[in-house]
């Protein structure tokens, strides 16, 4: 490597360390369960996104095993060559039937699905309007796209209206259904009406809403009784697996098959995974008890901790515990681990400056006893117990 690149890398890492923002992966066993192991110690896990408790569900494990016996391991090619199997087709059909769309284009990740649409659809002269707290995949794609990107204050419909009022070019408004770091929901009904009034299109990334909210877990859009032009659902949260799909009308689906490079030039999802995902869709649709359990746990969380200054009320399993200062958040997370609770400090640039927090996530597999332990530890480490 050249000296210039070496120096650049060293300087960037040094700056992150000095800011207290350096990150690293830790080797975790059973990180998809409510009790994980790290370096021989066991912790209650309140950091995973396995909201419905499917990631280690034995029925889903068996479905993947059945898929392996039918299709083998990898897909062997991109979807437009030989990588699109009956398992992929069945998954797409299942998603369309469940969510009410004509087409479902599959991707290896939500990051890819988000970027694929923006890169394929937008041209110079278009207007892209995004919530300031949208996921990094969306913001990055907007910065790199030929369109003009404007960002509006989080969930501020008046600011969005002002931006759209000033434009007469093709416009795409992008938001998240549930925001991953705050756990709050977008005002989708009002936003949908606003985009229709301005003849703008609407894209919703519902990674953290689908499976959790709405009838049969159809997500935040169904809960708000709206149908966006483009709906992204990801499989790494409530589905307990990985990957993503972009739901559209048939014409847009045909367009993506031609021009969405993340889809065209990537190896298709393993067919066994697609087979298991179809089973996950059925579980999500029919096992309402998982969402009922989550609602019970959310009520408990509010009862135990609702009076604390760090508490933030949400209608989702994402429960931010606001700290503010970065080093303080890291210290509180470490003290929680010393008490047997695995929580992760979320720091800038993932969240805005001075809003560092613990991102607490609930799973349908958590017990009431585990919730009580979490509350006791949080109150203890913050000196209010």
Curated annotation (Swiss-Prot):
Keyword Transferase: yes
Enzyme class: transferase
Enzyme nomenclature, EC number: 2.3.1.47
Keyword Chaperone among record annotations: no
Gene3D superfamilies from the UniProt entry: Aspartate Aminotransferase, domain 1, Type I PLP-dependent aspartate aminotransferase-like (Major domain)
Associated pathway: Cofactor biosynthesis; biotin biosynthesis
Catalytic reaction(s) noted: 6-carboxyhexanoyl-[ACP] + L-alanine + H(+) = (8S)-8-amino-7-oxononanoate + holo-[ACP] + CO2
Cofactor: pyridoxal 5'-phosphate
Binding site for pyridoxal 5'-phosphate: 110-111, 180, 208, 234
PTM annotation (N6-(pyridoxal phosphate)lysine): residues: 237
Superkingdom in the source lineage: Bacteria
PANTHER family named among the record's database cross-references: 8-AMINO-7-OXONONANOATE SYNTHASE (PTHR13693:SF100), CLASS II AMINOTRANSFERASE/8-AMINO-7-OXONONANOATE SYNTHASE (PTHR13693)
Biological role stated in the UniProt entry: Catalyzes the decarboxylative condensation of pimeloyl-[acyl-carrier protein] and L-alanine to produce 8-amino-7-oxononanoate (AON), [acyl-carrier protein], and carbon dioxide.
The name this protein goes by in its record: 8-amino-7-oxononanoate synthase
Higher taxonomy: Bacteria, Pseudomonadati, Pseudomonadota, Gammaproteobacteria, Vibrionales
Gene that this sequence comes from: bioF
């Amino acid at each position: 490597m050249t000296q210039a690149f070496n120096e650049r890398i060293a300087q960037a890492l040094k700056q992150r360390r000095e800011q207290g923002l350096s990150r690293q992966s830790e080797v975790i066993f059973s990180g998809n369960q409510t009790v994980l192991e790290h370096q021989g110690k066991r912790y209650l896990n309140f950091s995973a996104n396995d909201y419905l408790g499917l990631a280690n569900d034995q029925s889903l494990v068996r479905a993947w095993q059945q898929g392996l016996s039918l299709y083998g391991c990898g897909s062997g090619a991109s979807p437009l060559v030989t990588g699109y199997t009956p398992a992929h087709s069945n998954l797409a059909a299942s998603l369309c039937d469940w969510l009410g769309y004509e087409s479902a284009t599959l991707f290896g990740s939500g990051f890819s699905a988000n970027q694929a649409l923006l890169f394929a659809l937008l041209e110079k002269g278009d207007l892209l309007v995004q919530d300031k707290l949208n996921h990094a995949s969306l913001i990055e794609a907007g910065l790199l796209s030929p369109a003009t990107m404007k960002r509006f204050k989080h969930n501020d419909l008046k600011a969005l209206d002002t931006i759209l009022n000033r434009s007469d070019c093709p416009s795409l408004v992008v938001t998240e259904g549930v925001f991953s770091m705050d756990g709050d929901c977008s005002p989708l009904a009002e936003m949908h009406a606003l985009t229709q009034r301005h003849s703008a299109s609407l894209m919703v990334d519902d990674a953290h809403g689908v499976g959790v909210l709405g009838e049969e877990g159809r997500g935040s859009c169904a809960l708000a009784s709206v149908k966006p032009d483009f709906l992204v659902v990801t499989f790494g949260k409530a589905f307990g697996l990985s990957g993503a799909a972009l739901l559209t009308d048939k014409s847009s689906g045909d367009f993506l098959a031609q021009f969405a490079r993340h889809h065209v030039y990537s190896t298709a999802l393993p067919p066994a995974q697609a087979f298991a995902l179809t089973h996950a869709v059925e579980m999500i649709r029919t096992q309402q008890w998982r969402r009922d359990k989550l609602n019970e746990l959310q009520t408990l969380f509010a009862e135990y901790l609702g009076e604390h200054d760090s508490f933030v009320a949400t209608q989702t399993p994402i429960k931010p515990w606001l700290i503010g200062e970065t080093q303080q958040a890291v210290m509180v997370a470490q003290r929680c681990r010393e008490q047997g609770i695995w929580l992760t400090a979320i720091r800038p640039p993932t969240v805005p400056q001075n809003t560092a927090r613990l991102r607490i996530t609930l799973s349908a597999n958590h017990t009431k006893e585990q919730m009580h332990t979490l509350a006791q530890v949080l109150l203890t480490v913050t000196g209010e117990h």
